[in-house]
Amino acid sequence: TVYTVGDSAGWKVPFFGDVDYDWKWASNKTFHIGDVLVFKYDRRFHNVDKVTQKNYQSCNDTTPIASYNTGBBRINLKTVGQKYYICGVPKHCDLGQKVHINVTVRS
């Protein structure tokens, strides 16, 4: 399954609760190995950093596991477990531009 993060809103700083990546977007989806996350955004203003849980919680992007900046990033989910993504532009993560998912094996 291909999932566009934020659906039609895409990957952006949430304004007035228009997007809630964890509670409204990710919480009602089941992610499996083989699925694809698509981050759509204006690369002049945003990016995507895969980070650890600790860095997700503190919005620290100084040591990302991986970085993406095409504006149309396709991330293949290849391993099980918790995955954490933030926007590395200053203050964007603090304002809610972050998402975490749990990848499981398809039964």
From Swiss-Prot:
One Pfam assignment: Cu_bind_like
Phytocyanin domain boundaries: 1-105
Record: residues binding Cu cation: 46, 87, 92, 97
A GO molecular function held by the record: electron transfer activity
Keywords: Copper, Disulfide bond, Electron transport, Glycoprotein, Metal-binding, Transport
Cleavable signal peptide: none
Positions bearing carbohydrate: 28, 60, 102
GO cellular component: plasma membrane
CDD domains in the cross-refs: Mavicyanin
Disulfide bonds: 59-93
Segments passing through the bilayer: none
Domain of life: Eukaryota
Protein name per its UniProtKB record: Stellacyanin
Native source species: Toxicodendron vernicifluum
